[in-house]
Amino acid sequence: MERLYILNPYDSNHINLLMSYEQEHKVSTKSLESIMKVRDSLTEEEYKQLKKNANEIELSIFTEESGKIKDLCFIQGENDIRTCKLFFSPTPEKVRTRKLLNLATDFALNTLGMQSVFVVTTANDKTMHINLENCGYENLGEEKGSIIYLKEREVEKVQHKHQ
C-alpha cells in the first residue's frame, strides 16, 4: 500500500529511504540537500520552533511503497504571499500518471494554505505536461527551456442577489 509522508530531517528511516532513492535512481535531490543542512545547523526542538514561526517553507513529501520511496516532491514557498513551487524528482521510468502531483498540489493548497502553486518542468517532459494539465494547471509558457505551470486556489465567488 502506498503511503504519503512529510520528510522528517530527524527520522533516520526517512533519511535512509531518501539516500537509497538517490542511489537507485542516480539522482541528487533538493530534499536530501535541504534536510542535511537542517540537521547540521539545528536541534530537533529548534527546527520545530522555527517551522511554527517561519515565513519560508522548505519541506519534502514522498510516497512510500514496499519500503522504498516511490516518488518525491520538494516544496519551497512563502507563507506571507501564500505562493510555493513544487519540484519533482526525475523518475527514470515513464510514469503515465503521477499520483504525487495531485497529492502535493492538494497538500500545498489545502494543508499549507497556499493560493498559488507553480511547477517548472523541462520542455521535453511531455508526460509531466499532460499530468499537470490533467491536474488543472495552466501552462504559462516557456522560459529558458523550461515550461512554467500555475494552479491557483479556486476562490468561491459570492453572488449578490438584487432584490
Describe the residue ranges of each PLM region.
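Acetyl-CoA-dependent GNAT
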Residues: 39-83
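A short, internal acetyl-CoA/4′-phosphopantetheine-binding micro-motif in the GNAT/acyltransferase core
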Residues: 62, 86-96
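A conserved beta-turn-beta hairpin within the catalytic core of GNAT-like acetyltransferases
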Residues: 76-87, 113-115, 143-147
